[in-house]
Regions:
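Active-site loop segments of alpha/beta catalytic cores
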Residues: 1-38, 44-48, 71-81, 89, ...
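Active-site-flanking structural segment that lines cofactor/substrate pockets
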Residues: 35-67
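Intrinsic-disorder/low-complexity, polar/charged segments
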Residues: 43, 50-57, 109-115, 125, ...
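Generic hydrophobic, aliphatic-rich segments that mediate packing or membrane embedding
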Residues: 58-65, 112, 127-134
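Extracellular glycan-targeting catalytic surfaces
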Residues: 59, 118-121
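A subset of solvent-exposed loop/turn segments in beta-rich extracellular surface proteins, enriched
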Residues: 92-116
Length: 350
């Protein structure tokens, strides 16, 4: 059984990660591997309404995860997010949310550019009110046992554009209506940032900072994770034109911003490294992917920014990364199928 790391020791390692300080080893942790559960979504199929989300079931599930995993997470910080499987901000933007088996989808909501004015944050929006109710219940229920997060954007403003407008339409809009795409991006940033700030205002800090996002991470101040899955269909030039300004704008509103990438988006790394406002890069390897060919790119990232690798990885793969990369500003979080697997992984490193 691996040593249980205290929250105080975890905080010291998180601070070293963000500051890219010299340390004795990378930040190493283990997290649950499964995709978000939809147990708390009562409607089994079709369009979901705010009242279909079960607060008590969400609390029960989070407690179960905390009890099972809290001693086998290594440096990772358990954090309770309000039903983080749910695309809250898409719903606030007016996208109908559809359940299909265990998946939740946001359907397009912007058929005509004349509807763009509707896309804004409204504290009286029923979806925001429901998220706020979930968050308030989590804070009361956690009672200081574990932190409550508010920084999970699920998609973030970049990918939100694609969901709100629809993938095919947005692909054409990039060429036919570039100014409207920029206006859409700005509204997505405004909505996401305002909603997260409003939730943060209702959540207590944890050991002087904020815990949040699906990475089970902690930062010395407010932070968010955002994604850019949309960039798979963009050239570097289009990425610089439409995506970078959104990342920069969001990062100016939060002191700590983590940009999530898959292998299909790694061509954007050189551009992202030039965006000073982005704090750190996060890479999720595809299932079964050999990360060795990515080590030179990871080294480039670590020269400029902290790097978090979080996903399904073998111990051998993690060991190779540690052997070949500087440890300053490096974090590895292993997704594991069970607490027993997590314990074995951590025993290999800690």
């Amino acid at each position: 059984m691996p040593r249980v790391i205290s929250d105080q020791e975890k905080i010291a390692r998180f601070r070293a990660f963000w500051a890219r300080s010299e340390t004795d080893r990378p930040l190493i942790g283990a997290t649950i591997a499964t995709f978000p559960s939809v147990r708390a979504v009562r409607r089994e199929a079709g369009l979901v309404a705010p009242d279909d989300l079960d607060i008590q079931e969400n609390l029960k599930e989070l407690d179960e995860e905390w009890q099972a995993w809290r001693e086998v997470m290594g440096d990772a910080m358990f954090v309770a997010n309000p039903l983080w499987a749910f695309p809250w901000h898409l719903a606030m933007a007016g996208c109908p949310i559809k359940r299909d088996a265990d998946n939740l989808w946001g359907l397009p909501a912007l058929d005509d550019w004349g509807q763009l004015g509707r896309l804004r944050f409204d504290p009286d929006n029923p979806w925001f009110r429901r998220q706020f109710e979930f968050t308030h219940a989590l804070v009361r229920h956690a009672a200081g046992r574990y932190p409550v997060g508010a920084g999970q954007l699920m998609l973030g403003p970049v990918d939100m554009m694609m969901q709100v407008r629809g993938q095919e339409r947005l692909a054409l809009d990039l060429y036919d209506s570039p100014e409207m795409v920029r206006a859409l991006g700005q509204r997505c940033v405004n909505l996401c940032a305002a909603a997260v700030h409003a939730i943060y205002a209702a959540v207590p800090t944890h050991l002087g900072g904020r815990a949040g996002t699906i990475r089970y991470f902690w930062a010395p101040g407010e932070f968010v994770e955002t994604a850019e899955d949309i960039s798979f269909m963009m050239s570097p030039a289009l990425h610089r034109q439409f995506v970078v300004p959104i990342h920069r704008e969001l990062s100016q509103r939060f002191p700590y911003t983590l940009v999530h990438l898959h292998s299909a988006q790694l061509h954007t790394v050189p551009t992202l490294l030039d965006v000073e406002e982005i704090t750190a890069i996060q890479i999720t390897p595809d299932f079964g992917e050999d990360l060795a060919p990515k080590i030179p790119l990871m080294a480039q990232i670590l020269e400029r920014k902290p790097l978090l690798v979080h996903g399904v990885m073998t111990v051998a793969s993690g060991s190779e990364i540690i052997r070949n990369l500087p440890i300053r500003g490096l974090a590895l979080l292993f997704r594991c199928d069970s607490p027993a697997e997590a314990a074995k992984v951590l025993d290999s490193f800690l």
